[in-house]
């Protein structure tokens, strides 16, 4: 019987061996990480069972590792845990790849060794057979060459026996030759297979060399990362001590935060009451708008009356000018009369002898004085009347200007109040959206303990700003009633045509340049309040996240 070549191992058996190797590699990895990780406290597993939290989400309930204990409070802990997980996954992948490659290499080497052994044994066996056949042929040749002694013809002669043996040996040689040819062909096929397998093995060896180089590089990186991890572990140990101190502080802060939540609930109730008040104010504003429309019609009528009064004043001015001209003429006449009287006096002085003439002169002088006094009194009365009329007109203009200013101020106040109402509504909407986002994000811890102090300060600032807004809202409610009463214009007071348009269609600084500074100032103040409210809202959101972490 010829020796049969060894077959490669069954694939199912190779898979089982690979699985066993993988399990062994995993066990080695676990043992390696247990050696590298620092001492875990004794009560860690108990805390895990009591809290019922998974090792990925639990942060303060159980101490899993120095990387896991700091997650949720510091960003460095989370980064270290992620790097550890990445390194573990990479290391596991590399270990699996090494195990699989080593298993494949071992299988291929075993196959090659078995094939080499079979080929060597077959060659030895063939050489041994050839040697035997050569010896047998040599013996036969020697026997045929030697002269045979004649023997008695008792039976078949030795020559015949030798011929029979030679024929039998030839047949055996032919069969052996055929077998040798078949074996040679098999050996050629096996040699081809061996060459192909050797080429594949060379390619695999090259790949393995590349993988080994990569593994060496990765091992160097892992060593560096291990050093970094050791440093991080030392830092984490220090952080654990700090965290224990911070937990006590956090308990105190939780109580404070609960009190702040109660305050916020009270503030929400107050905001709801303010919303109701704002709705009532909106209804009042609508009524005021209707009244203002009626007042517009009255103002138009007053404008028409004022135009008529202006025309009358112009006519009175013309009359006054005519009266002044007449008075000037009368003064000239009086001057002429005085000159004449002076001449008459001179003449009378010459005629002193005549007492009757003196009496006449005295009477004439008295009459002239009476006429002068009457004329002066008439002039004074007319001037007083004109002055009274002018003063009345000036007073009406002043009142009209004052009414315009008051009306403009009231319109600006109403606009500011409406803007504040809109801002308060926007703030309430933002608060509602913020509460919803906070309830959704309670399971995701984001910030650490160092940010808690800043966030608590921001929450205190938010409370102060809300109190200031409440105070300003309470102080502006009585102003609303006063502005509604003052918005009613005085009957008979003139109002310009573009005054109501600025309040109804939107005030523009081009129509009223004197009031643009006030409006801009109020807008800037409102913008600052909005920014402060947004900042405080963000602080409240961060505070809620810290509450969920605790």
Curated annotation (Swiss-Prot):
Biased composition (Basic and acidic residues): 467-480
Residue numbers spanned by region Disordered: 1-77, 467-529
Low complexity bias locations: 484-499, 517-529
Family note: Belongs to the GOLGA6 family.
InterPro entries named in the record: GOLGA6L (IPR026737), GOLGA_cons_dom (IPR043976)
Name recorded for this polypeptide: Putative golgin subfamily A member 6-like protein 19
Paired cysteines (S-S): none
């Amino acid at each position: 019987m010829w020796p049969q070549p060894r077959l490669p191992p069954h694939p199912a058996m190779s898979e089982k061996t690979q699985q066993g190797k993988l399990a062994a590699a995993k066990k080695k990895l676990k043992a390696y990480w247990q050696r590298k990780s620092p001492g875990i406290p004794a009560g860690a597993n108990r805390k895990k069972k009591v809290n019922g939290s998974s090792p990925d989400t639990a942060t303060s309930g159980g101490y899993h590792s120095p990387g896991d204990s700091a997650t949720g409070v510091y960003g460095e802990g989370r980064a270290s845990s992620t790097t550890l997980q990445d390194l573990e996954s990479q290391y596991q992948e590399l270990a699996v790849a090494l195990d699989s490659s080593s298993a494949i290499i071992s299988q291929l080497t075993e196959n090659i060794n078995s094939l080499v052994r079979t080929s060597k044994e077959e060659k030895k066996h063939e050489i041994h057979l050839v040697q035997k056949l050569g010896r047998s042929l040599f013996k036969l040749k020697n026997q045929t060459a030697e002269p045979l002694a004649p023997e008695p013809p008792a039976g078949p002669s030795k020559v015949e026996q030798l011929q029979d043996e030679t024929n039998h040996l030839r047949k055996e040689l032919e069969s052996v030759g055929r077998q040798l040819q078949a074996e040679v062909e098999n050996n050629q096929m096996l040699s081809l297979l061996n060459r192909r397998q050797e080429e594949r093995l060379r390619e695999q060896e090259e790949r393995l060399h590349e993988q080994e180089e990569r593994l060496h590089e990765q091992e160097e990186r892992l060593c560096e990362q291990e050093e970094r991890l050791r440093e991080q572990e030392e830092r984490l140990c220090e952080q654990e001590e700090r965290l224990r101190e911070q937990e006590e502080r956090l308990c105190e802060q939780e109580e404070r935060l609960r009190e702040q939540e109660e305050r916020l609930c009270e503030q929400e109730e107050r905001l709801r009451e303010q919303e109701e008040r704002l709705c009532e104010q909106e209804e009042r504003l609508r009524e005021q708008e209707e009244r203002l429309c009626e007042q517009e019609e009255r103002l138009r009528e007053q404008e028409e009356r004022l135009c008529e009064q202006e025309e009358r004043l112009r006519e009175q001015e013309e009359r006054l000018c005519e009266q002044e001209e007449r008075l000037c003429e009368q003064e000239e006449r009086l001057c002429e009369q005085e000159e004449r009287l002076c001449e008459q006096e001179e003449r009378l002085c010459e005629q002193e002898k005549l007492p009757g003439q003196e009496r006449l002169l005295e009477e004439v002088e008295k009459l002239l004085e009476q006429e002068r006094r009457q004329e002066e009194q008439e002039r004074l009365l007319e001037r007083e009347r004109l002055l009274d009329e002018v003063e009345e007109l000036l007073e009406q203009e002043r009142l009209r200007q004052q009414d315009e200013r008051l009306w403009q101020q009231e319109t600006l106040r109403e606009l500011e109040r409406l803007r504040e109402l809109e801002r308060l509504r926007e703030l309430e909407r933002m608060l509602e959206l913020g509460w919803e986002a906070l309830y959704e994000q309670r399971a995701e811890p984001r910030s650490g303990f160092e940010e808690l102090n800043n966030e608590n300060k921001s929450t205190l600032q938010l409370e102060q700003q809300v109190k200031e807004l409440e105070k300003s809202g309470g102080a502006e409610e009585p102003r609303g009633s006063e502005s509604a009463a003052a918005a009613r214009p005085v009957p008979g007071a003139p109002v310009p045509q573009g005054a109501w348009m600025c309040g109804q269609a939107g005030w523009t600084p081009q129509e009223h340049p004197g009031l643009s500074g006030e409006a801009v100032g109020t807008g800037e103040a409102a913008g600052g309040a909005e920014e402060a409210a947004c900042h405080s809202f963000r602080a409240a959101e961060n505070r809620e996240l810290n509450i969920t972490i605790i």
